[in-house]
Amino acid sequence: PHVTNQLIRQALHPYPDDLVIVTKVGARRGSDGSWPHARSRQEIIEAVHDNLRNLGLDVLDVVNLRLGGFSGPVDEPFEEPLTALVELKQQGLIRQIGLSTVSPEQVAHAQAITDIVCVQNFYNVAQRTDDEFVDLLTAQGVAYVPYFPLGGFSPLQSSKLNEVAASLGATAMQVAIAWLLHRSPNMLLIPGTSSVQHLRENLEAARLEPVSYTHLRA
């Protein structure tokens, strides 16, 4: 469970001044590969200190609190883990706090407790439940971090995306990323990147002109 942070440290430490590292707490890796909740006050504190140690940092730029589940946001109390993060922020161990897999109502409730700088939810050109939520966060100046840029596509939607990609000489992933980039100015993307070539392909998505795939919004 600590491998990713250790690899980041090996590759990038000492970190450049303009690098922002975002971590996530609220779940732990089970021995069976599952991700059960880990949201008690003590679990949150331990997770933050684990991140600090494995990354070789004295303070974490942003810590996202993971709520909900793989099926989406869940209406459940989260004051205990959020309050723990606020305490750690007051201690100078965290600079900013974000939320993951949450509803607009949960974000509003959290904002009554502390500042929220980002929201990480499932969103892409085919999964548009958060359309109004994205616009609300844009108006508030809160970053929106969509995950699974190709998740949840029907066969018809996948076929249409592939057609658009072929017409542009691009991959389906590049078109999906480009659509997100141009959807709203508060988008921060986290596409999976498994190799240097994969990274280059993802970066090429920024070259696509939005006029080429505007009809995908329909």
Where are these regions (language model features)?
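Acidic (Asp/Glu)-rich catalytic clusters
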Residues: 10-16, 53-56, 111, 135-139
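Glycine-rich, proline-tolerant flexible connector loops at the mouths of alpha/beta enzymes
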Residues: 1-7, 70-72
